[in-house]
């Protein structure tokens, strides 16, 4: 089987190389076809000579076989063979050797004349082709919705390039930092060539034509330092606000997706020396450490207990004492890290440096899930004698849907009184029905905003706490079931706006994302306890991770939105009274922008992510009197690479299903020929609020499939995905997978009806939620549209996934048992009607447990269903990287798909034993 695949790959490579000369331009097409005829004749002559001398049968593929590998060349190849079946031994095209004597001179003269005419026409067509610049790569041509052909004549995208990151745009992250005296436009640079190891620099000095207001300041001269005879090397650095000290993390060891353990040191900028964070415990595994806003103290968590180190003393103060395996202080447990904070911290300083808010998490009732490691020992511990041959098991407190959640409390610590206290607010959720999703201090006022939801995330409560008075009240309460029946997403974008009467802000307030007429928009709540916002944005579009920044001096709010299109991103500003909205980016040209603003919002790093070659530029914002612009990355190397390669043709369009307009991108192979029949691969993720179709530049595995293998790849963002309004998003609640699968199937039927699509060769693939959607689509479709599917790390029963994520979209299993039954992959009879499908999973997946795949396999076994393949990866988590596993995943997807579209799985389904003639043995 491997040899057969290898042979197909070699033939595919040879034929696509020839086909790269073909173009939709008529002149180019003439040139390419003519040269292809002569090339083929030349190849046959050479092959004939070689094969005759070796006395073997010629190895050209039988007629029609290569249709599976390269349809475009097959079309030309078959047409030529049907017109004339050349006998190579007696061919008039042989110009030397014995057969040349038998060729009639007149015939030979006629052949030379005809050949000369063909060559002359070929040269003329070539000049026309070059004159029209038809050789330009499609990446240089704006996206054309009506485009049917690439004009490239370059190399194919390779798997090695994609896997090696060669198509990844170079991006520079700027760590904006506020100056000790409030200066704006300062950035932190670590490890830049030709500079001290850690410096603070005015961004304007990056452009040699401008002068910054701050001289470069060195925080750490060298990339190493010594403490008690130890040589230490920084992994992470955190300067104090006054820039006099640096908190340095070394010996970092990963924990979960975001969290890690490290040893911490306090580095003095003036003396360039360091001391341990805790002089008594130099080797303590610290989970989190953060500076006081006043630069005079550091709070940290070690072994799930909280501690305080004041710089005025080497003594460490222990804040909590009962932390351990079941109680967490200041750091989240697994599910809060993964699904709520998307980070490792549950500690918040107020601006005055007087108070610390922190989360206490009680996991005592949360069931454990065992993660087994058969090859490695992530704990770093040596096994006990006699247990060397047993796998290491890590027990994780993992609340599955309907199981007990961790209970959380928000506690406060008074620095000066050395006192921990809690503020109780009447009318709150029961502890088992409470999620605390955001904490925002109101500057130095001693007040904090706390965002809470119920367990199913459909009731929101915003609480305002006064820690000085130790009292609080509910300032907003929203039951979304009365609005659109959806859910509240976890958000940490609330921005506090301090009062400034002289600047038109008589009261303090905050900006938050709100639901307005079916879309996510920005609202400004002022005073803080006002439940009715000033509407800052409105319309049939949405804000994205907003606000991005607030310019308090000029009362401006900056944000990114989908105003121009659901699949693009532009940057805007709006005044705090909701007027004068302006674009910061050029909206006359489509673009997918990201933005990172300086601390005072006077400067912004613009990230242009597509559809063209990405670039980065630092500019001053419109309200900044000092106009500044500096390009820091153009990705010229990537641009040159794109010119030399045949990239897929991207066709953006929409489909309307059940009244919903959905975004689609079709990746066509270079040199697309609408007269041919192409196999089609659907790729999806499809998770709630996600987006896969966008105008960002991306050369990925799907690009490789289209460019190298010559298949069409289609992605549709169905119902449930983001940025097309809440009506389309929330319709899936309580029954995830149903509408999403329908949208994939109906879109696939549209493609199957196209003249250039081979409806018998359609496949679908996805990872994680996309793996679930792949199986759900195959189940719903039952072989009617899709013949093949490839699912990586799929959820197969939402009862097995974590509670906070799942119940947000499905309610609890106790509340919605029928919905959970419907969403599970259980109709194995329907799966048996597909030609074949593939499932892959990491054995040590702590996110989507291997339990999902194993229970599906059991259902298939019980029903006697065998039309599938399985590959598991020992010790790999959800990303599947352990011991070269990630490359194996994509190699497997690649080879499995080629075999599918070559018809191998049809032959496998009806296996016939090879008959051997005993007389010839």
Swiss-Prot record:
* Gene Ontology process terms (BP): proteolysis
Give ranges for the Cytoplasmic compartment. Answer: 1-109
Reaction equation(s) it catalyzes: Release of an N-terminal dipeptide, Xaa-Yaa-|-Zaa-, from a polypeptide, preferentially when Yaa is Pro, provided Zaa is neither Pro nor hydroxyproline
- Annotated Gene Ontology MF terms? aminopeptidase activity; dipeptidyl-peptidase activity; serine-type peptidase activity
Q: Which UniProt keywords apply?
A: Aminopeptidase, Glycoprotein, Hydrolase, Membrane, Protease, Serine protease, Signal-anchor, Transmembrane, Transmembrane helix, Vacuole
Q: Where is the composition biased (Polar residues)?
A: 8-17
GO CC, any one term: plasma membrane
Q: What is its EC number?
A: 3.4.14.5
Q: Where is this region: Disordered?
A: 1-33
Look up and give the membrane topology term. Single-pass type II membrane protein
The record ties this protein, via Gene3D superfamilies, to: alpha/beta hydrolase, Dipeptidylpeptidase IV, N-terminal domain
Q: Does the record bear Disulfide bond in its keywords?
A: no
Task: Answer yes or no on keyword Iron-sulfur.
Answer: no
Q: Which residues are glycosylated?
A: 362, 822
List, from the UniProt record, the residues annotated as the active site of this protein. 768 (charge relay system), 845 (charge relay system), 878 (charge relay system)
Topological domain (Vacuolar) residues are 131-921
Q: What class of enzyme is it?
A: hydrolase
Tell me where it resides: Vacuole membrane
Segments spanning the bilayer are 110-130
Family, per entry: Belongs to the peptidase S9B family.
Q: What does this protein do?
A: Type IV dipeptidyl-peptidase which removes N-terminal dipeptides sequentially from polypeptides having unsubstituted N-termini provided that the penultimate residue is proline.
Put simply, this protein is called Probable dipeptidyl-aminopeptidase B
Question: What is the species listed in this Swiss-Prot or TrEMBL entry?
Answer: Sclerotinia sclerotiorum (strain ATCC 18683 / 1980 / Ss-1)
Gene name of the record = dapB
């Amino acid at each position: 089987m491997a040899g057969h695949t290898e042979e197909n790959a070699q033939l595919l490579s040879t034929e696509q190389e020839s086909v790269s000369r073909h173009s939709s331009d008529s002149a180019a097409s003439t040139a390419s076809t003519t040269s292809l005829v002569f090339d083929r004749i030349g190849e046959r002559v050479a092959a004939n000579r070689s094969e005759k001398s070796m006395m073997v049968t010629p190895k050209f593929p039988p007629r029609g076989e290569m249709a599976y590998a390269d349809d475009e060349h097959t079309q030309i190849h078959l047409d030529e063979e049907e017109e004339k079946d050349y006998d190579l031994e007696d061919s008039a095209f042989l110009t030397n050797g014995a057969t040349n004597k038998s060729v009639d001179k007149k015939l030979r003269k006629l052949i030379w004349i005809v050949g000369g005419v063909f060559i002359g026409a070929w040269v003329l067509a070539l000049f026309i082709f070059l004159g029209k610049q038809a050789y330009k790569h499609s990446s240089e041509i704006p996206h054309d919705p009506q485009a049917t052909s690439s004009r490239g004549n370059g190399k194919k995208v390779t798997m090695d390039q994609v896997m090696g990151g060669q198509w990844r745009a170079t991006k520079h992250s700027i760590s904006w930092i506020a100056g000790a005296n409030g200066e704006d436009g300062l950035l932190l640079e670590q490890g830049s060539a030709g500079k001290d190891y850690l410096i603070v620099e005015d961004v304007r000095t990056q452009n040699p034509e401008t002068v910054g207001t701050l001289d470069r300041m060195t925080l750490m001269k060298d990339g190493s330092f010594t403490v008690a005879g130890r040589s230490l090397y920084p992994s992470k650095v955190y300067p104090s606000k006054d820039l006099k000290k640096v908190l340095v993390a070394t010996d970092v060891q990963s924990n979960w997706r975001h969290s890690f353990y490290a040893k911490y040191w306090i580095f003095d900028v003036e003396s360039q020396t360091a001391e341990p964070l805790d002089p008594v415990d130099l080797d303590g595994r610290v989970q989190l450490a953060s500076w006081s806003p006043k630069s005079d103290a550091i709070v940290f968590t070690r072994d799930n207990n909280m501690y305080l180190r004041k710089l005025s003393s080497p003594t460490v103060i222990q804040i909590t004492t009962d932390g351990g395996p079941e109680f967490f202080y200041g750091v989240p447990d697994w599910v809060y890290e993964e699904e709520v904070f998307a980070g490792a911290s549950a500690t918040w300083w107020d601006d005055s440096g007087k108070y610390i808010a922190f989360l206490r998490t009680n996991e005592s009732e949360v069931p454990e899930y065992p993660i087994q490691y058969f090859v490695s020992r992530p704990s770093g511990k040596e096994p006990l004698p006699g247990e060397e041959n047993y796998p290491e098991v890590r027990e994780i407190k993992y609340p599955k849907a309907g199981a007990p959640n961790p209970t959380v409390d928000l506690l406060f610590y008074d620095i000066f009184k050395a006192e921990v206290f809690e503020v109780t607010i009447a009318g709150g959720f029961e502890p088992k029905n409470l999620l605390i999703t955001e904490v925002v201090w109101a500057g130095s006022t001693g007040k904090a905003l706390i965002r809470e939801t119920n367990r199913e995330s459909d009731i929101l409560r915003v609480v305002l706490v006064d820690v000085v008075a130790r009292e609080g009240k509910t300032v907003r309460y929203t039951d979304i079931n009365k609005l659109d029946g959806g859910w509240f997403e976890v958000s940490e974008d609330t921005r506090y706006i301090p009062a400034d009467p002289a600047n038109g802000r008589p009261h303090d307030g905050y900006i938050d994302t709100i639901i307005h007429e079916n879309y996510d928009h920005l609202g400004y709540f002022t005073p803080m306890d006002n439940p009715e916002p000033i509407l800052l944005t409105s319309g049939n579009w949405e804000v994205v991770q907003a606000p991005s920044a607030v310019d308090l001096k000029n009362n401006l709010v900056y944000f990114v939105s989908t105003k121009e299109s659901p699949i693009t991103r532009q940057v805007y500003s709006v005044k705090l009274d909701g007027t004068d909205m302006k674009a910061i980016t050029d909206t006359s040209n489509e673009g997918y922008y990201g933005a990172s603003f300086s601390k005072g919002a006077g400067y912004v790093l613009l990230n242009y992510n597509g559809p063209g070659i990405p670039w980065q530029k630092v500019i001053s914002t419109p309200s900044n009197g000092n106009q500044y612009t500096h390009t820091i990355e153009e990705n010229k190397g990537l641009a040159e690479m794109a010119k030399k390669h045949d990239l897929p043709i991207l066709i953006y369009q929409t489909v309307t299903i059940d009244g919903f307009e959905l975004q689609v991108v079709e990746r066509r192979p270079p040199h697309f020929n609408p007269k041919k029949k192409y196999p089609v691969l659907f790729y999806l993720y499809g998770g709630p609020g996600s987006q896969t179709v966008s105008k960002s530049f991306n050369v990925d595995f799907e690009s490789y499939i289209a460019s190298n293998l010559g298949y069409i790849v289609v992605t549709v963002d169905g119902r449930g995905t983001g940025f097309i309004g809440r009506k389309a998003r929330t319709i899936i609640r309580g029954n995830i997978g149903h509408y999403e699968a329908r949208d994939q199937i109906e879109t696939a039927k549209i493609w199957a009806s196209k003249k250039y699509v081979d409806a018998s060769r359609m496949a679908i693939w996805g990872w994680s939620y996309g793996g679930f959607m792949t199986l759900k689509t195959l189940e719903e479709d039952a072989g009617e549209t899709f013949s093949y599917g490839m699912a990586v790390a799929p959820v197969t029963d939402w009862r097995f996934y974590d509670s906070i994520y799942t119940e947000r979209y499905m309610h609890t299993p106790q509340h919605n048992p029928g919905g959970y039954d419907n969403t599970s992959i259980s109709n194995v009879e329907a799966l048996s009607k597909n030609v074949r499908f593939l499932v892959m999973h990491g054995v040590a997946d702590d996110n989507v447990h291997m339990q999902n795949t194993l229970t599906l396999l059991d259902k298939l076994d019980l029903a006697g269903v065998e039309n599938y393949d399985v590959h598991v990866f020992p010790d790999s988590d959800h990303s599947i990287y352990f011991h070269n596993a990630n490359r194996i995943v994509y190699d497997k997807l690649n080879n499995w798909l080629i075999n599918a579209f070559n018809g191998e799985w049809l032959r496998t389904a009806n296996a016939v034993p090879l008959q051997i003639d005993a007389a010839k043995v």
